[in-house]
């Protein structure tokens, strides 16, 4: 008869960002534990609040399945001595399996007999196996851990309770400094300690103490309550998904409410108000039916609606203090001069090993000028890039950005416009931070994109030059994100700028502030980001073939990846790749100093292939270029069928290898086809 298992770990308040991943991890680790211990189950449901992580297993087998395993030992000639008795090797083998030599049998494997034993292990009761479930809790990993009291161990937060129930039976075990029981803690203010009656009664037992254990249910409650407020007040609430996920992990019993603030604060830029509400106070933004910001907010209380008016007033008071700061900085910052702020950037450190922000901007300006030409910007756009590069970090010294650092770039755009800067310059100041997250929005203007590329390139080269290179998962300066941004921007705008030549040109630049070094590491790092971009859809062999090509133009590489993936599902892919691979492998033996001499051709196939190569222009899209190469497959095969490439005559051999080298030279601009797998 199957059973239901409940495990709940009661902790001190968890950071909101840890709750959901930890809930998922607990479920996955327990599933692995049960599977490895031969305990079958029907379903696993996980629970979490800021003060608990829990999991319930339904339909858990009452006993492990029996285990029968065959073990292969030494060969028979080693297992038996000259008298036919079992040797020490055979005896040691069976002893290690907990058996005797009586269990030995011989089985033939590839013409030779070997010792085999079969071990039967009866399944243990689930209750006995589950005493080891603390291994699951101990194996949990967290981004941060802590000590408490005088304990030597670490965990995400102090543990207060552990409940492990098999149906309604409490299992007896210890974890850290806690002994298991069936007592759980209710809501910190509204509830009290409560007894969990059984695995099935878990949610109801906690609900009676004002705890909604199911995160999905809490989320549904929050959304439903907000929707009710929308209808009652005739407004629209921005239910930001990230904020919603954070808020539901801050509360155990949610109650949404609406507060307000004076309309005068609406004169402050919307981004300031939204940042104050969303990022600093965890409030949802309220708009009218036309989408205009309203002097209201929605927050979620961790509790019921008792004394809710006092709660609303308290939240309003806290928000007004934030808005007062924003209004003050908005007013005072407009008195500042951009030129004065830029001059002060010489005293702001970019990084202690690299220099000041002003020096970073100087290098960025030079790189931006080069990129603007590579991207074929107009003279007007080039001028905008140059002006933006001179001032684009000035807002870091404004009071607003000092208080709300999330607004860097955003306030720079607004202050630049107020100071009379060109709109393209102002937009570039905002856009140079983009993309600011994996998959985040990209710059929309060419001027902003060029400035973003230049800023990210100098950042990458500067940090690598002083040895601050990411390793493993450690990337404190977000260089992977910056480089991924470079790749995405180049692809988005379709700029066919050869990255290898571009980086070479940057290393030729001379700056008093810093000398770029570690070029090989930089190139490998950029290749890894391109590889990651292709990895979303392309298998490893296709990615490696493209990265080994003679072209390092990001949009083309990504387009070739897509074209090769599509082509790999067609009938002519395998024969085409195989013929090209053969050509690539032989071409490696070619003498680079030898050029094709048609007078040495001995058959029509040499003439035909050479003419086809001469006419190969590789024009059009990546798919079209790929087709232009693939269509040569019959010609290549005909050449191989009728021509001895590695002829004894050295001149003939070198000439034929030179033909293949010419083919490879052109085809390799697409991919190194001998890296592709056709098996």
Swiss-Prot record:
Signal sequence range: none
Any single Gene Ontology cellular-component annotation: cytosol
Major subcellular location class: cytoplasm
E.C. no: 6.1.1.14
Enzyme class: ligase
SUPFAM superfamilies according to UniProt: HD-domain/PDEase-like
Domain of life: Bacteria
One GO process term, biological-process aspect: glycyl-tRNA aminoacylation
Family statement drawn from the similarity comment of this UniProt entry: Belongs to the class-II aminoacyl-tRNA synthetase family.
Protein name: Glycine--tRNA ligase beta subunit
């Amino acid at each position: 008869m199957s059973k239901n298992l409940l495990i709940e770990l009661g902790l001190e308040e968890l950071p909101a960002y840890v709750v959901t991943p930890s809930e998922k991890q607990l479920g996955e680790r327990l599933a692995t534990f049960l599977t490895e211990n031969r305990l079958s189950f029907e379903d696993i449901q996980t629970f979490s609040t800021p003060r608990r992580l829990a999991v319930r297993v339904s339909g858990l087998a009452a006993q492990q399945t029996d285990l029968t395993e065959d073990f292969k030992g030494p060969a028979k000639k080693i297992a038996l001595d000259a008298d036919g008795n079992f040797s020490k090797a055979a005896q040691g083998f069976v002893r290690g399996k907990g058996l005797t030599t009586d269990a030995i049998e011989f089985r033939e494997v590839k013409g030779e007999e070997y010792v085999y034993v079969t071990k039967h292990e009866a399944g243990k009761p689930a209750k006995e196996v589950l005493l080891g479930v603390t291994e699951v809790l101990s194996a949990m990993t967290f981004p941060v851990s802590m000590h408490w009291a005088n304990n030597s161990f670490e965990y995400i937060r102090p543990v207060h309770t552990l409940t492990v129930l098999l149906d309604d039976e409490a299992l007896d075990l210890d974890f850290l400094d806690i002994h298991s029981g069936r007592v759980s803690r209710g809501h910190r203010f509204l509830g009290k300690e409560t007894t969990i009656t059984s695995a099935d009664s878990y949610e109801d037992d906690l609900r009676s103490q004002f705890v909604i254990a199911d995160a999905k249910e809490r989320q549904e409650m929050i959304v439903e309550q907000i929707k009710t407020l929308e209808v009652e007040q005739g407004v629209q609430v921005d239910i930001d998904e990230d904020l919603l996920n954070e808020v539901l992990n801050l509360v155990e019993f949610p109650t949404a409410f609406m507060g307000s603030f004076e309309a005068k604060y609406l004169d402050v830029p919307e981004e300031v108000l939204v940042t104050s509400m969303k990022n600093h106070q965890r409030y949802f933004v309220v708009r009218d039916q036309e989408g205009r910001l309203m002097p209201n907010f929605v927050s979620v209380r961790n509790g019921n609606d008792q004394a809710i008016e006092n709660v609303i007033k308290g939240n309003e008071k806290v928000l007004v203090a934030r808005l007062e700061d924003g209004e003050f900085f908005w007013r005072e910052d407009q008195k500042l001069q951009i030129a004065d702020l830029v001059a002060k950037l010489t005293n702001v450190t970019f990084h202690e090993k690299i220099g000041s922000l002003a020096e970073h901007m100087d290098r960025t300006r030079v790189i931006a000028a080069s990129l603007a030409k590579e991207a074929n910007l107009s003279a007007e756009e080039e001028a905008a890039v140059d002006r933006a590069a001179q001032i684009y970090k000035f807002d870091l010294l404004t009071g607003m950005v000092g208080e709300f650092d999330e607004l860097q770039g955003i306030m720079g755009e607004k202050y630049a416009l107020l100071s009379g800067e060109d709109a393209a310059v102002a937009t570039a100041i905002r856009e140079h931070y983009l993309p600011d997250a994996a998959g985040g929005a990209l710059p929309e203007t060419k001027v902003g994109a060029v400035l973003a590329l230049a800023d990210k390139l100098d950042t990458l080269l500067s940090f690598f030059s002083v040895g601050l290179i990411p390793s493993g998962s450690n990337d404190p300066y977000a260089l992977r994100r910056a480089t991924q941004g470079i790749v995405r921007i180049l692809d988005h705008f379709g700029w066919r700028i050869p990255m290898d030549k571009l980086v070479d040109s940057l290393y030729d630049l001379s700056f008093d502030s810093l000398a770029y070094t570690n070029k090989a590491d930089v190139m490998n790092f950029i290749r890894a980001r391109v590889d990651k971009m292709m990895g979303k859809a392309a298998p490893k062999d296709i990615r490696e073939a493209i990265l080994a090509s003679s072209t390092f133009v990001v949009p083309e590489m990504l387009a070739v990846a897509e074209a090769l993936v599509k082509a790999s599902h067609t009938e002519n892919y395998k024969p085409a790749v195989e013929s090209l691979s053969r050509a690539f492998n032989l071409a490696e033996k070619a003498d680079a100093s030898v050029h094709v001499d048609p007078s040495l051709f001995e058959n029509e196939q040499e003439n035909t292939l050479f003419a086809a190569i001469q006419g190969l222009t590789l024009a059009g899209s990546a798919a079209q270029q790929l087709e232009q190469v693939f269509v040569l497959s019959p010609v290549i095969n005909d050449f191989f069928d009728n021509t001895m490439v590695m002829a004894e005559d050295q001149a003939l051999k070198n000439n034929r290898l030179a033909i293949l080298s010419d083919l490879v030279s052109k085809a390799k601009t697409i991919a190194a086809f001998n890296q592709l797998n056709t098996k």
